[in-house]
Amino acid sequence: CGGGGGNSGTGSAAGGTGRGPITFVTGKDNSNVWAPTVAKWNAAHADQKVTVKEQSDQADQQHDDIVQHMQAKDAGYDIVTVDVVWTAEFAAKNWLVPLKGDFALDTSKLLKPPVVAATYHGTLYAAPFASDGGMLYYRKDLVPNPPKTLDEMWSMCSIAKQHNMNCYAGQFQKYEGLTVNAAEAINTQGGQIVDGSGKVTVDSPEARKGLQMLADHYKNGDIPQEAITYQEEQGRAAFESGKLLFLRNWPYVYNLATTDGSSVVKDKFAVAPLPGVTGPGASSLGGHSEGISVYSKYKATALDFLKFIEEDAQQKFFMEQGSLAPVVGSIYADATLVAKYPYLPTLLTSIQNAVPRPVTPFYPAVTKAIEDNSYAAIKGDKSVDQAIKDMSAAISAASGG
């Protein structure tokens, strides 16, 4: 396991291509996937041990922690966990080693959407290790055939009324989850918040239609009043307690709704792709990748660790231990796993139809513009027309730097 010395190259970005102990920075390891993964690596790499540094479980705090350490050119953060929406910002600031040339990664066996999400201006900057896509959880005892279109789903709200339940919820509190849900509504109608070149394109009839749908169904009660306070966990609790017919949420809910002692829907629910206009809707793409800091002294070790977490065995472990969506496509066809996790084919459909949230180096300000205006429109504090105009103006202002 040779390699250049830690001082090879010129300047911090090119230097540190050798091997040695590294620190891996990630959000709070709630599902206990990293301790065993790192233990397995360390058992085989005595002189290149990986130490895990856990951050908080709040995405904005994780983001700010990485920013702080990168601005300080801290060599102690060798590998950082990058939420799909941070790629552009970290790449534009030259904080991540481009994964090309000597640092190239083979992405041929990976699903395309997570690779695209880890790419900025045509260059891969991080190694995808877990993807994520939204799914529609539904009560199969009350809805034998899941809705394929939005119109079908909303028409089924009469079933909820018959059973004194609420119909539909997603994540509508004013936080990142609302950007996810608003973007799904807009993209599913054929709208786009920001185009591929970074131009703001949200001021369109399609975007208005998407946001209007959420506002209308909140107003008429199909989306219950309390759903404006829901993040992921509040929606899960409502669904598990039998109060909701439909819930838009991430795959992690599946195992919990099946095993939680308090869940009254254990054998009564199933999942389907998010409904769209004529077929599957456009989920917002979730997930994380791992980037190598340009300030790391041991980039060769970091690259090997990135390759290790993309191996099939590790990807299966992440799936089974943490309900993390694999980035290796073939795993979704693994008969043993599908028998154990029946939602895998639905999740694959979701990821394949997923749309990244706006790709921009100014993401924190852009998502705030989306959240604030979507929230105001759904609550009825602003007309949808005004909310879209204000959103467009605020995103343009943020993108101007």
Language-model regions, residue ranges each:
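Conserved C-terminal helix/tail region of periplasmic/extracytoplasmic solute-binding proteins
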Residues: 349-401
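Long, aromatic- and glycine/proline-rich binding clefts that accommodate carbohydrate-like moieties
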Residues: 117-118, 269-272, 320-369
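Glycine-centered hinge/linker elements that transmit conformational signals in sensory
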Residues: 156-157, 199-228
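Extracytoplasmic/periplasmic substrate-recognition and gating elements
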Residues: 43, 212, 219-222, 258-323, ...
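Conserved N-terminal structural module of periplasmic/extracytoplasmic solute-binding proteins
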Residues: 1-88, 263, 276-278, 300-301, ...
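Short, solvent-exposed loop/beta-turn-alpha elements that line the ligand-binding surface or hinge
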Residues: 100-110, 172, 191-209, 259-264, ...
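Short helix-initiation/N-cap motifs at beta->coil->alpha
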Residues: 55-66, 85, 151-152, 226-240
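Hinge/lid segment of periplasmic solute-binding proteins
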Residues: 84-133, 145, 152-154, 164, ...
